[in-house]
C-alpha cells in the first residue's frame, strides 16, 4: 500500500491510522485529505440525488447535483468554482456509468445499483458531518 510506504498511514495492530500529529507525514496526509474532500462530497451529492429520485435522466442528475453543490458551496464556504462545475459533474456521472455503479434503464434514465449503494455508504462516512447531514435532509430534488 503506497500510503503506508510513504508514511501517510500507519499500521497499528489491525487498524490503519493517521501518522502522529506533529510529523511532516501527518501534514501531508491532511493536505491530501483536503484535496480529496471536494471529490468525495461531489460523489455524495450525486449518489444522494440518485437515491431520492429512484430514476433520473443523466442531464437532470448533473443539473440537480450542480445546484445542490452550489448551495453547499455557499453554505459551507467552499470557494472553488470547480466544486460545482458542469464538466466535473459530467465526468463524474460518466465514470459512475463506466464502472457500472449506476444502471442505465431501457428508457435511458439512470438508477442506483447495489454497488452504488455500497459506495454511497462508504462515501457518507468520509464527507464532512455537516455536508452529510444537509444531504440527508433533502427529501426531494
Region locations from a protein language model:
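Membrane-interfacial terminal anchoring regions of lipid-handling membrane enzymes
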Residues: 1-141
Amino acid at each position: 500500500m503506497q500510503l503506508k510506504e510513504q508514511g501517510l498511514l500507519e499500521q497499528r495492530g489491525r487498524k490503519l491510522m493517521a501518522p502522529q500529529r506533529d510529523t511532516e507525514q501527518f501534514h501531508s496526509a491532511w493536505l491530501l485529505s483536503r484535496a480529496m474532500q471536494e471529490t468525495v462530497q461531489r460523489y455524495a451529492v450525486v449518489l444522494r440525488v440518485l437515491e431520492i429520485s429512484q430514476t433520473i435522466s443523466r442531464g437532470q442528475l448533473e443539473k440537480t447535483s450542480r445546484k445542490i453543490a452550489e448551495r453547499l458551496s455557499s453554505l459551507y464556504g467552499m470557494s472553488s468554482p470547480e466544486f460545482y462545475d458542469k464538466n466535473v459533474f459530467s465526468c463524474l456521472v460518466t465514470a459512475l456509468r463506466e464502472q457500472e455503479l449506476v444502471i442505465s434503464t431501457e428508457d435511458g434514465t439512470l438508477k442506483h445499483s447495489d454497488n452504488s449503494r455500497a459506495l454511497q455508504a462508504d462515501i457518507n462516512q468520509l464527507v464532512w458531518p455537516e455536508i452529510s447531514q444537509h444531504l440527508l435532509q433533502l427529501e426531494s430534488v
